[in-house]
Amino acid sequence: MKIDMNLLKRRIKVANKEVKADTVVKNGKILNVFTGDIMRGDIAIVDGFIAGIGQYEGEQIIYAQNKVIVPGFIDGHMHIESTMLTPNELSKVLIQHGVTTVMADPHEIGNVAGIDGINFMLNASEELPIDVFIMLPSCVPATSFENSGAKLDAEDLQPFYTHPRVLGLAEFMDFSSIVNLNEKMLQKIINANLNGSIVDGHAPGLSKEELNVYISTGIYADHECANVREAKERLELGMYLMIREGTAAKELKKLIKVVTPTNSRRCMLVTDDKLPDDLIVEGSVDHNVRLAIKEGLDPVTAIQMVTINAAEFFGLRSFGAIAPGYQADLLILDELQNVSIDKVLKKGICVVDNGEIKKEEFKINDNSKELAMKLPKINMKELEKNAFKIPLSSDLCNVIEIVPNSLITYHRVEKVDIDKGNFSVSIANDQLKMAVIERHHATGNIGLGIVKGFGIKNGAIATTVAHDSHNIVVVGTSDEEMFLAVNHLKKMNGGIAIASGKEIIASLPLAIGGLISENGYLEVQQQLKILNQALSIIGVNADFNPFLTLSFLTLPVIPEIKLTDTGLFEFKTFSHIGVQA
């Protein structure tokens, strides 16, 4: 909210007790995130902002009943598209978990639809009961070694910096463009700097020497640390550390030990990519806070990491604290240790009471379906009969091995079965066939590879959620089932499909860009439940999420080996390699 003279005068009068506040929250224990202390006092709210803490009278009184009051939670790095929900539907889920503000990077929809994709996300996230700030996608496409739906140069992004909810440039992931002095990419960093905006990072696997080069450009945060050493190095060199706990990438338990009383204010908790069923049941960064506390972190420190730390990094001076002049985003907790949420106040209005949405305060007109009319449809070349054949002259091959609950893969060289000069799937060795089909420009590109770790016994899984270019990715035990799953995606204009034998046994349509559902969050949750149940039919019994794991096997900017529509890609050499070793 922009403040004007009348609003400022009114706030001053309430603070000075000349007029009553709109709302006063009484009888609570207030967590001061600046000092770490618990304070007593009334919280006086006017026009959505805190006017003062002390003894106040208001038109409306909310009694906290001696419960703990903390600032609304901030997720400092996430992708709305990964939730498969429209911003409107996502806000209904997040607000119940105390998340009142998110920093969203729309690089998924940006890779599919370019400028139209960013505009869709900005327009669809207007006037929600949470604040959605946008970090502009920095690398569309992620690399030049694949085909995305769009390309975004510095001049394409420049106009967006004037938007009040655009805060900066998101996860700059193309390290090679920095070290090779690629002026087109460097201009994006310069433009962000000239606009007084932030640049955050994405730098897995860099040595300390490479990290110096990376940070010298003005990139000051990273969420891609794979181990304690990398986390410490980033903190030592002045970066903010974003500790990630999502659906596929679960790094909090191993990285939280890095957080100390002296460095904790440089640390945040984020989700990055989390599926809707996990968000609904488990939670967002509220879950991360609970997990951090369970791992031994001081509760106050954990709360700071999703409030004031994030707000200060992103330059949101009126967010992340309970103090005069700050936005009245408040959580009333039954218990601090378990982060059990009783009430949520957004800009001073109680939108969640007793853990349930107050529907009368939650009036939202979801226009996402109409806004999505401008977005492109699936445009793939018809598959030929032998499209998934992998010809081999030797049985020694480069194999992608998935790492459960991680985005990293292992590069293995293994002996494989050959039948009539082509790779033959081995259920016994868990060596399955994988393909990435270009779906934006009907180029006919198909990248082929071998993957292990899914444990599929009979069937195929296909999806249009394939980071970051979001082509179609499919894995399976037979070409016929892979064909069936891919063609079903085309009929739905995107989504997830599981094939077994000659039929589709479960699917989830994602008609908005092949990434987002048009349905409500409870319906999407039910569809995902059916998909998960169908996994057992094709023999999958995994302790990780196969759908999101498959979606990240196509991201070449994460080690060690991935598959794009142009072929197998090795991170170490940052180049293509053949299937045959």
Curated annotation (Swiss-Prot):
Enzyme class: hydrolase
Pfam families, alphabetized: Adenine_deam_C, Amidohydro_1
E.C. numbers: 3.5.4.2
Annotated coiled-coil segments of the chain: none
Record has Hydrolase as a keyword: yes
Any single biological process term in GO: adenine catabolic process
Cofactor(s) required, per the database record: Mn(2+)
Domain of life: Bacteria
Record keywords, A-Z: Hydrolase, Manganese
Claim: Hydrolase is one of the keywords in the record: yes
Catalytic activity of the protein: adenine + H2O + H(+) = hypoxanthine + NH4(+)
GO MF term (any one): adenine deaminase activity
InterPro entries xrefs: Adenine_deam (IPR006679), Adenine_deam_C (IPR026912), Amidohydro-rel (IPR006680), Metal-dep_hydrolase_composite (IPR011059), Metal_Hydrolase (IPR032466)
Signal peptide: none
Family membership: Belongs to the metallo-dependent hydrolases superfamily. Adenine deaminase family.
PANTHER family: ADENINE DEAMINASE (PTHR11113:SF2), N-ACETYLGLUCOSAMINE-6-PHOSPHATE DEACETYLASE (PTHR11113)
The protein's name: Adenine deaminase
Lineage, uppermost ranks: Bacteria, Bacillati, Bacillota, Clostridia, Eubacteriales
Gene that encodes the chain: ade
